[in-house]
């Protein structure tokens, strides 16, 4: 069957992105708007927000064959084992029906020792999904959670229209590389994607690898994005970048929450503290690549801070959980829709004994499944009837 019908790629077909940039090749999904990107000078966040975690094409069609032309950008770390290609996953009526990868594209080579980067342009690739059921159906193509992807062209063997919006509530989540999906098996295997699917909500994933840092421009982006439930997972990046001390942390959390509440005054909002991570439980940052492990061809991390500096204000995960619990308790006196969740309820010490973090920092696929299953219970508690859209931000 030949996919000969070309459908223009527009925002009506894309979910989970805050903005689509028109490039020389096609559409580049962004998870932060242009105004926020203009205020950011950190290449790590620029990389993370342009990786389309949680972004998917959502179509209604009878098509049995779907082709998507993409221009992927591959990351290569000099001296480290090669990274697997990003995965595109196709779902039919919510069920997995195909996987594909772009085997080539632009390449960015990163020198971990110096931070220097080198870019090589590459070709557009065509992803083909065939033998889909010949009936009207909802088709989603989830883009790789960890690979910058430009959408170039969409072809099918039957007409396509945008999938109906439906009345599923929108869950907006913000967090670190763990929320972004680091080391998950694929884009539907990140814990936020799993939790959303299990609880029947629409995901907007603002998990940014290395970049959940209480940035005011991120708070403004959340403020201005419609959502029926907001969850903010705060802590691990602030510790492993050694970004701030206790004195700055509390006011920064208050400011972030104040900004989000300007647009969502009564939206259910849950602050989630860090998962259990032995490296930083009681040892401050910064965290760094373990060069001995790299020399053996393994990727691992270590904490470089000194626990003796905690009384002087250095942050650890233990301190951050205490602070977040205190702040949410204080604020909830005037904010009945604000809650606190200890991240160790999602992944705690006993989980770590059974499913350790392979590189000391990031969960693998099995651990993403465990966290996602547990978080689905949190979402079901918020939306016991499968939810009802309320919209927001407030006019």
Give the label of every model feature segment.
Residues 1-170, 291, 380-395:
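N-terminal secretory targeting modules
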Residues 68, 174-175, 272:
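Short hydrophobic segments within beta-strands
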Residues 132-133, 139-226:
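Serine-esterase "nucleophile elbow" of acetyl-processing enzymes
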Residues 191, 249-256, 320-327:
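A general structural detector for well-ordered alpha-helical segments in enzyme core domains, enriched
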Residues 195, 214-262, 270, 274-284, ...:
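Oxyanion-hole/transition-state-stabilizing segment in secreted/luminal serine hydrolases
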Residues 200-202, 226-229, 264-269, 335-338:
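Loop/turn elements at helix/coil->beta-strand transitions in domains of secreted/extracellular proteins
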Residues 205-212, 240, 360-363:
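Acidic/histidine-rich helix-loop elements
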Residues 278-395:
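Catalytic His-Asp segment of secreted/periplasmic serine-dependent ester chemistry enzymes
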């Amino acid at each position: 069957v030949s996919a000969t019908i070309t459908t223009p790629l527009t925002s009506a077909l894309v979910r989970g992105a805050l903005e689509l940039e028109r490039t020389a090749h096609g559409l580049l999904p962004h998870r932060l708007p242009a105004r926020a990107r203009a205020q950011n000078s950190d290449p790590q966040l620029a990389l993370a927000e342009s990786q389309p975690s949680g972004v998917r094409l959502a179509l209604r069609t009878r098509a049995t064959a779907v082709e998507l032309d993409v221009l992927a950008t591959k990351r290569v770390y000099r001296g480290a084992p090669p990274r697997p290609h990003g995965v595109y996953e196709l779902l039919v009526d919510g069920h997995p029906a195909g996987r594909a990868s772009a085997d080539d594209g632009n390449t960015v080579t990163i020198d971990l020792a110096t931070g220097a980067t080198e870019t090589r342009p590459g070709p557009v690739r065509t992803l083909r999904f065939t033998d889909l059921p010949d009936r009207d159906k909802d088709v989603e193509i989830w883009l790789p959670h960890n690979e910058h992807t430009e959408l170039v062209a969409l072809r099918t063997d039957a007409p396509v229209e945008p999938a109906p919006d439906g009345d599923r509530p929108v869950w907006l989540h913000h967090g670190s590389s763990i929320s972004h999906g680091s080391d998950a098996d694929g884009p539907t295997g990140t814990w936020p994607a799993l939790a959303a699917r299990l609880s029947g909500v629409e995901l907007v994933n603002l998990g940014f690898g290395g970049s959940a840092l209480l940035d005011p421009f991120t708070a403004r982006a959340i403020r201005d994005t419609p959502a029926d439930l907001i969850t903010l997972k705060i802590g691990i990046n602030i510790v492993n970048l050694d970004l701030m001390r206790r004195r700055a942390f509390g006011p920064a959390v208050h400011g972030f929450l104040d900004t989000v509440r300007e647009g969502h005054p009564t939206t259910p909002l849950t602050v989630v503290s860090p998962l259990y991570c032995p490296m930083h439980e009681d040892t401050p940052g910064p965290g760094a690549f373990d060069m001995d492990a790299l020399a053996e061809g393994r990727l691992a991390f270590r904490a470089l801070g000194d626990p003796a500096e905690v009384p002087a204000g250095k942050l650890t995960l233990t301190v951050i959980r205490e602070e977040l619990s205190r702040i949410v308790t204080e604020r909830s006196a005037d904010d009945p829709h604000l809650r606190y969740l200890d991240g160790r309820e999602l992944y705690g010490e006993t989980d770590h004994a059974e499913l350790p973090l392979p590189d000391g920092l990031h969960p693998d696929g099995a651990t993403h499944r465990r966290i996602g299953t547990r978080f689905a219970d949190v979402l079901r508690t918020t939306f016991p009837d499968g939810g009802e859209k309320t919209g927001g931000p407030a006019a």
